[in-house]
Amino acid sequence: MIALIQRVTQARVTIDNEVAGAIGPGLLILLGVERQDDEQKAAKLCERVLAYRIFSDEQGKMNLNVRQSGGRVLVVSQFTLAVDTDRGLRPGFSRGAAPADARRLYDDFTDRCRQTGIRTETGRFGADMQVALVNDGPVTFWLQV
């Protein structure tokens, strides 16, 4: 399971010209689900992402996690993260989970985020979405379990 996380000052996801989810300062999490992923990996990745200290403390050091910073979370499914780009000029999608499995694990991940009490917004799994963000820093990390 892969999370491309970005520290943002704001982010929103739009579907069919309607805002599906929006946050102010916090984390935009682009989530990719691979074939071998399961609930245990979703739990581990969620815990790691939410504990990852990429927000500045009073001294300007990256020392706070999203909860400590008072931030929010926007989770967007992105199957293109689970690709094979080692050969050729077109991505291969054989590493990605089947849609039903990916949806179940995406829902599991977002439910776990919500259960922590951090305000969590989402896109819609499988939808054609437009994501707008202001990356703060820029600060972007690739986390994988």
UniProtKB/Swiss-Prot annotation:
A motif (Gly-cisPro motif, important for rejection of L-amino acids) lies at residues 137-138. The keyword Aminoacyl-tRNA synthetase does not apply. The keyword RNA-binding applies. HAMAP family: Deacylase_Dtd. PANTHER family: D-AMINOACYL-TRNA DEACYLASE 1 (PTHR10472:SF5), D-TYROSYL-TRNA TYR DEACYLASE (PTHR10472). A Gly-cisPro motif from one monomer fits into the active site of the other monomer to allow specific chiral rejection of L-amino acids. This is D-aminoacyl-tRNA deacylase. It comes from Sodalis glossinidius (strain morsitans). The gene is dtd.
